[in-house]
């Protein structure tokens, strides 16, 4: 039996610019499930989930955490970030917030992940960036491929709950 902090498989860290690395990523169960606001459905399997999360983290310019750690049997993360925009659409990036719930199985492996990105327009942009990167690697219906530019809400939703970030520029 492994613990929630024990490494069973090491993922490729595509986001070395981020100070925080979630070690539960290196302990994905073979049948792990990833659900999130950026998906129209869910991803299953350690290889698929690992590939998705490893790349998705690379889209963050920074992560400012309000909280991360164990709460009972769950691991929780609450953070804000900035994701890159496109050349024609918010090239300086878009503010995005995420609340993550990590569930563990009886063996201590990461068995389910629920990621709640907000606001919706930023989550849809994030989904479209994932779609553009992965192409047909995953079912295209898993991602949003429409235009969010007319509906983008790009303002601070933190209500002062996050510390000011010194990481404001897209690298």
Q: Each predicted region: which residue ranges?
A:
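C-terminal and inter-domain tail/linker signature
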Residues: 1-171
């Amino acid at each position: 039996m492994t613990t929630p902090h024990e490494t069973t498989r090491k993922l490729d860290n595509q986001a070395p610019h981020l100070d925080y690395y979630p070690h539960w990523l290196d302990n994905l169960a073979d049948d792990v499930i990833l659900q999130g606001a950026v998906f129209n459905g869910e991803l299953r399997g350690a290889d698929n989930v690992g590939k998705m999360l490893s790349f998705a983290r690379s889209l963050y310019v920074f992560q400012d955490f309000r909280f991360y750690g164990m709460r009972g049997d769950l691991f929780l993360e609450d953070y804000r970030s900035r994701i890159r925009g496109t050349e024609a659409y918010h090239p300086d990036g878009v503010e995005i917030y995420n609340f993550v719930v990590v569930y563990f199985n009886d063996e201590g492996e990461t068995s389910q992940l629920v990621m709640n990105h907000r606001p919706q327009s930023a989550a849809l942009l994030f989904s479209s960036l994932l779609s553009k990167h992965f192409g047909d690697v995953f079912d295209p219906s898993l991602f949003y491929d429409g235009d969010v530019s007319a509906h983008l809400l790009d303002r601070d939703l933190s209500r002062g709950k996050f510390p000011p970030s010194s990481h404001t520029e897209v690298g």
